[in-house]
Amino acid sequence: EGQFAVRLRIPSWVKDAPANNDLYTYINKVGNYTLKVNGSSVTPVEGDGYATIARTWKAGDVIELDLPMEVRRIQSHDEVEVNRGKLAIERGPIVYCLEGQDQADGKVFNKFIPADTQMDAAFDAELLNGVVVLTGTAKEVDLDGKVKDVPFKAIPYSTWNNRGRDHMV
């Protein structure tokens, strides 16, 4: 109990900046974090990546910090030539990828995901001891150049190649 400040780390991905520089930017903006003390919203002092709450604290006070974990698209600075026209997919701090064995045809290089594609996040308890996967509809290009809609599944990049060697994009 007493008068003191509590500082909570607010990750850059919550503040519409995937990194603390201009190398990467989010295409889609999302809502900010919310902070409550004992169920009531508070407006903290922000600075240096922290939200600071200064007050008189009592035993049993509860702080609730809600960090939005929405699916985002990231693009790199246009001067990174190899990344022009490409986007990364992120949910919270996790970067996602497509792995061949999760796609109906086992391929990944024949697919693209339009920037406005709706993606849904769901926990898959059976996959790699449990991970959140993203699903949606991608565009698939066949050898004749025809394009069709196909379902896709994206997994956390950190889990790629944990089920054997496979293609990834």
Question: Where on the chain are the PLM-derived regions?
Answer:
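Extended extracellular/luminal ectodomain segments enriched in beta-structured repeat modules
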Residues: 2-6
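C-terminal beta-rich recognition modules with glycine/proline-rich loops and embedded aromatic residues
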Residues: 1, 15-37, 46, 50-58, ...
